[in-house]
Amino acid sequence: MAATKSKAAKKGAPLLGKYELGRLLGRGTFAKVYHARSLAPGADPVAVKVLDKPDLAAAGAGMATRVLREVAAMRRLRHPNVLRLHEVLATRSKVYLVMELAPGGDLLSRLASLPSRRLPEHAAQRVFLQLVSALIYCHARGVSHRDVKPQNVLLDAHGNLKVSDFGLAALPDSLRDDGRLHTACGTPAFAAPEVLRRKAYDGAKADAWSCGVILFVLLAGHLPFDDSNIADMCRKAHRREYALPRWVSQPARRLVSRLLDPNPATRLAVAELATHPWFKRSLSLDSQLGSLLGGQPERELAFQAPPPLNAFDIISMSPGLDLSGLFGESKRRREKRFVTTASPERTVERLGQAGAKLGYFMVGKKGVERLPLGGLSGLVAMSMEMSEVSPSMMLVELRLEGGDDGDGDGGAEEFGWEELRAELGDDVVMAWHGCDGGKKDKEGILL
């Protein structure tokens, strides 16, 4: 019966009463991916990965483990540049992974369609920004991808990146007693030398090497190390036998060199990329708004003297007086505020660092005015306003301005406010509104 239903679903009949499978998007050894229409009113189309249980069983325990690992990894990840897993369905003979649709195809195909097979450096910066933002997020949650390559980087309808295929991902329980990984996996042309030599390795540092290869491909249009003999390719990688074209800038060359360092101990980590001059420019507010909006972005977030709070504002912060009920539920989900004694510069710096991990970027008031209605293709923009409580204390108000999923709530219901609070730390957040269930926060201040 289940097998009959699965076969019928391919002909247009509803899949378990929830989805209608359409055209075939792609196929692998053990899976087929279909374009599908959700039967829920107003829902976006999805991609459904169909796996045959008997085929998985015949392939041995390794393939089934890979599927389980992929599901486990994707379920703990929710980032604008990570392909989202909506749900997992199953019948007696099939497993269905219902995922976000990425109609733009993969990055390799997109590059292959270009005459030069490469991107201009400013465009490569934007692509690399999204890739690294996704991997910083994954690593912060204990997930090492281990197969980062252009084929596993998909594009949505607006050209935004979606990291996919977590079948080889390593989770915290994959680590041995020495705290390292020992399974050699991935695609040789993008795998780190220590992985190819079957040594114990750090998954995040291995992903950093793969990022270096991808950056090289984006800038040069070809692989840095390309040899059918894996031993020879590994030897070239250790000797750094690669050559970037003359048009690549010096900052970009230095970044590639730091990432394609055969010594993992001195190799630049993904989380450290924000400090590199070439990448720091693309992480700036100016670069992000310029590439995303196509206009003239703000040159900086001006640190003007925050306006003082009036008497009503201060009274509303008093212990025992909670005015949150005066505001709608949607507003409470979209807006948070906290008290800080940190400087404005320090506060914005920490918010920006947290954004690289959590998938948002900061904008000023002028930047908010230029944001297109409906958000930035899933990216989340956050605006901030500071008000002076006392000469040494400020109230910081945060508001989600982008990432609308179509419900008018800007993705606020799913935004990780608690994660943001943890990233900012107690040295920045003195008291936080809306996270303690109305209990008194530190220093006796209730917001």
From Swiss-Prot:
CIPK serine-threonine protein kinases interact with CBL proteins. Binding of a CBL protein to the regulatory NAF domain of CIPK protein lead to the activation of the kinase in a calcium-dependent manner. Its EC number is 2.7.11.1. It holds the Pfam family NAF. PROSITE patterns: NAF, PROTEIN_KINASE_ATP, PROTEIN_KINASE_DOM, PROTEIN_KINASE_ST. The lineage of its organism: Eukaryota, Viridiplantae, Streptophyta, Embryophyta, Tracheophyta. It comes from the Eukaryota. Residues 19-279 form the Protein kinase domain. PANTHER family: CALCIUM/CALMODULIN-DEPENDENT PROTEIN KINASE KINASE-RELATED, PROTEIN KINASE DOMAIN-CONTAINING PROTEIN. This is CBL-interacting protein kinase 7. Residues 165-194 are annotated as: Activation loop. One of its GO terms (biological process) is signal transduction. It comes from Oryza sativa subsp. japonica.
